[in-house]
Amino acid sequence: MRKDIQIFLLRAFRVVIILSLVSCSTQNEASIEFERLSSIAKSINIVRDDFGVPHIYGKTDADAVFGLLYAQAEDDFPRIERNYIWAIGRLAEIEGEQAIYSDLRARLFMTTEEAKMAYASAPEWLQLLCQSFADGLNYYLASNPEVTPKLITHFEPWMPMFFFEGSIGGDIEQIPLAGIESFYGADENFVVKDTSKTAVSDFIEPKGSNGFAISGEHTASGNSMLLINPHTSFYFRGEVHVVSEEGLNAYGAVTWGQFFVYQGFNENTGWMHTSTRLDFMDEFIEDIDKI
């Protein structure tokens, strides 16, 4: 009996030792990672003006992206996280069963494996920016332990491959969820409308943003002007100024969680995005015979 107790205690002691070693190893890895991120952060300066707009300065473009994502997270981490939860197809995990078809649509568009492959095959400069995207957000979470993510506790560099279209209602959202539900039997009476054959009498006022390019011939200053009126929700994008010593100097609007200025300007040019009827993605309607 005593021998059995000794064996049991010895095994229990070994388990405790193993768990302690694993815990120490995990803590050590986390400490090393935080030191790495802290070292990068020293190369970045974030200054907020009287309106709260962040002006981000980095030595390299990658440093600037790190600072940009950190500043975005300071302003609205929940929106960043939700954008990626939606993009990678995990919305139902926080919003319930009603989001299943949204998740299915996202995963039909791209799987995690495909996103990882896209990242692995990307040019080195883009990989660096994607890594800085993840580093900036992970540094924010590590530096602000009081922030509790709903789902994503660690961001990965392949995640931006899911979320590179920064408009509202763009890309995969043009495919109606009702059609996906119908395909899987939730609503067998759903019929996809062929909008290309809409009669003039049935004309529906188009929705979307307004963008105007005005020649200097028509302005008082003689300078060309861009006017963009993005039809988004009020807080869909944040205002930023991002600068690097490699030549980046852009001011404008950034969709939460993305690392490029979506609408803005620099010393020499300006850019805007608005809605058009360009065919930038493919949709197919197939007749499926039930067996």
Show the residue positions of the predicted features:
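Sec-dependent signal peptide recognition
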Residues: 4-18
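C-terminal motif of bacterial Sec signal peptides marking the signal peptidase cleavage site
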Residues: 22-23
